[in-house]
Every structure is written in C-alpha cells, then in structure tokens.
Amino acid sequence: MSFFKRIFSSEKKETLDKGLEKSKSTFFSKLTKAVAGKSKVDDEVLDNLEEILVSSDVGVNTTLKIITRIEKRVSEDKFLGTDELNQILREEIAALLSEIDSGEATEFVIPINVKPYVLMVVGVNGVGKTTTIGKLAYQFKKAGYNVVLGAADTFRAAAIDQLQIWADRVGVPIVRQNMGSDPASVAFDTLQSAVAQEADIVIIDTAGRLHNKVNLMNELTKVKRVMQKVVVDAPHDVMLVIDGSTGQNAFEQAKQFTAATEVTSLAVTKLDGTAKGGVVIGISDQFNIPVKYIGVGEGIEDLQVFNKYEFVDSFFK
C-alpha cells in the first residue's frame, strides 16, 4: 500500500501510471543495475543514482540536492539497505516538491473571491500550448465555470484557428481578431467581454516566439498592463507550458520565459511516450515554480491537475 495520501480516482491514477510508464521503466532498469549485488547504500550506489537522475532529465542542481538529502538519511541510519533506497528517494523528492508548493492539489478549481480569474498562458510554438488551453477550458467548464478564451497569439493564423476549433469543441465563447492584430487589444476586448458576461475564468493565449527576448518581454508587459485597465489585478496566474518530451531543451525554454516575464505556474505536456519525466521535478525546483497541470495522453481528459504525491508514486513505485 502506498504511503501517499490517496485523492485521485482509480481511473485518473491508471492514466497517470500509463503516461509515466516509459519514464518509470527506463529509470528502474538503470536503478536495478546500479544496486545489483549491493546490500547497503554506499558511495558507489549514490554515484550511480546521481548519474541515473541526471540522465532522467532531473537536472544537475536538483540531482545534487536529492543526493545530499539521501546521504543525510544514510548517515543517520548506517543500516539502510538498497531495498529501502526507492522509498527514501520517493519521500525526499516529494518533500522537495512540497517546499515549492505546500498546497494539496485539488480538482479544477479557482479562488472563490476572484471573478473573473485571469490566466495568461505563455510558451513556445509546438509545446501544446493551445491544446492545453482547450483542455483547460473543457475541464473548467465541466467543473461548472463560465469560461472565455482570448486568442492573443495573433502572429500565427493557425494559432487563432486552432483556438477557435477548441472553443467550438468545448462550447465556450472566444474573442479573436485578424492575424497581425495587437495582442494587447485582443486581451483587452476579451476581459471586457468576460466582465460583461460575468464569466468566471478568462484564458488568454499569447504568442510563442523566442527569437527576440526584448520584444517578447515588451509584448507580454503590454498585454498585462492593458488587461489591468479592465481587471486591476490581472493576470492572476501566468502559466508557462513546456513540452516534457524535450528534456533539457525545456529548461532553456523556462529560462527564456522567466527572464521575459514573471511565471507563476507550469504545465508540462507530452509526458506520455517519453523517458524524460524527471524534467517535471527539475524545472519546478530550479525555477521555484509550482507545476499545476501535466499532460499524460492525447485525450481531452488526459490533462491532469498535478499532485506531487501521486506523481512521485507513479514515477517511482
């Protein structure tokens, strides 16, 4: 029986387990070799574990933190065996993630005292940003909220059209303008429309271009400033969407966007079919940003609220 608190439905847990299967099997095949013939956790085992964590895209800095924590546990209990290593690893990684966000993950909910709740979504093209927005709209509508989408990624006609398709599929209103329109103008109109409709949630899609950090910074700053003319404290969340299957490249994306704007949460997509699931742990720790959602499949239901305990349980069990 897991030592973690059970709050997921069995169906969601099964989806999570399946989505992380490749990361888990790759990790454990390496771990099994690392501890072969060993009964105690010694320096060689820890060195091997360090290599495994780095190769799983946990990242060097985060890996060293984890190893230091395990070394402390080993020094406190000289009789710790390799059979207990996995359990210790799970506990320490869960503790590390808890330091970034101590809250318990819940279903798709927003603060009750904020209306409309404004979520601005950033991320490079191709990471699944627009798809994530569509799935979020579906989940929030399913939870009983009135959702409005804003197509402020105006530099790609495909982005506007894709968001329109999601709006039609989910059955939520969308505010859009022509390709090349001012993104801030779209965001402004979206918030005005949301206020008029007494919407609960506004999700704003933004341009995913990284070729010029200064332009990106200026654009996102302007979008924020203009939104605040309608909703004073908007946006309430700036969520960076990253592709979990890209491994170390995801770290670079996070570095670029956190330099351009304040990022308050992460959504990690495409974790199914990749062995790079450790990126969830590394990016959250390195940038001190909580993971809110993870994508573990292509289905509309396969965007899940991130629960650190269930994630660690699925990854390391």
Specify the residue positions occupied by each region the protein language model found.
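Short glycine-rich anion-binding loops that position phosphate/pyrophosphate groups of nucleotides
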Residues: 207-209
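Primarily NTPase-proximal linker/entry elements flanking Walker-type ATP/GTP-binding cores
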Residues: 17-152, 159-179, 187-195, 199-204
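Short, aromatic- and cysteine-enriched interfacial helices/patches
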Residues: 3-10, 28, 35-36
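Short hydrophobic/aromatic residue motifs in ordered secondary structure
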Residues: 60-62, 156, 272, 300
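Switch/coupling subdomain of P-loop NTPase systems
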Residues: 4, 10-16, 21
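Residue-level signal for short, function-critical loop segments
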Residues: 153-154, 244
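Short beta-alpha junctions and helix-cap segments that line functional grooves
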Residues: 3, 106-107, 136, 252-253, ...
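Conserved catalytic-core segment of NTP-binding enzymes
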Residues: 162, 182-197, 211-317
